[in-house]
């Protein structure tokens, strides 16, 4: 109603799991890419809550940015809702294995109870976004590599210590 009354154009964008450099790794539960990478850098196993076969649709932040620009430049996106993801799921086991292979290490998981209410699988139907001429371009392995480089620089600059990363995590308050 507001958009019609004031001739205001909008686009609603539903992000799935945005990944890549500059993620806020200081959150209570850090983004999975940063969490896994920093735990490995600190000689710890990545932490997983619940089923390590749960899967998510990970999209690179640069692909999300590209769709933002498309929305600003293309009138056909006005007053519509779009899912932004890749349309592909990657489970935590595969993600851990990809990261470990790129980092040339062998790691297991530190496993904790599931987080209450967390979905087992989540991915987006991106067909509507694709109908606007947009396609996600970044492969998950490229996103992992760029995130590793970013986090290595954060470590080098003294912004984070991978050996103490997540040591204050209160597991019992997170799990079910």
Question: Where are these predicted regions, by residue range?
Answer:
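Active-site "substrate specificity/gating" loop of NAD(P)-dependent dehydrogenases
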Residues: 24, 28, 51
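Short beta-loop-alpha junction of Rossmann-like oxidoreductase domains
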Residues: 21-23, 128
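Conserved sequence/active-site signature of Rossmann-fold short-chain dehydrogenase/reductase
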Residues: 11, 18-20, 64
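C-terminal substrate-binding subdomain of Rossmann-fold SDR/epimerase-dehydratase oxidoreductases
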Residues: 41-176
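Active-site Tyr-X1-5-Lys
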Residues: 1-11, 16, 37-42
């Amino acid at each position: 109603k507001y958009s019609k009354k004031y001739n205001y154009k909008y686009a609603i964008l539903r992000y799935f799991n945005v990944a890549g450099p500059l993620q806020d790794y200081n959150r209570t539960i850090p983004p999975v890419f940063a969490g896994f990478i920093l735990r490995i850098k600190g000689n710890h196993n990545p932490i997983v809550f619940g089923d390590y076969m749960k899967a998510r649709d990970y999209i690179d932040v640069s692909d999300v940015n590209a769709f933002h620009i498309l929305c600003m430049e293309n009138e056909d996106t006005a007053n519509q809702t779009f899912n932004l993801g890749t349309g592909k799921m990657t489970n935590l086991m595969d993600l851990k294995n990809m990261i470990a292979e790129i980092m040339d290490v062998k790691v297991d998981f530190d496993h904790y109870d599931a987080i209450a209410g967390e979905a087992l699988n989540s991915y987006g139907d991106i067909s509507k976004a694709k109908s606007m001429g947009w396609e996600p371009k970044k492969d998950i392995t490229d996103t992992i590599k760029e995130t590793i480089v970013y986090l290595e620089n954060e470590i080098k600059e003294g912004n984070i210590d991978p050996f103490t990363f997540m040591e204050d995590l209160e597991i019992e308050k997170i799990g079910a």
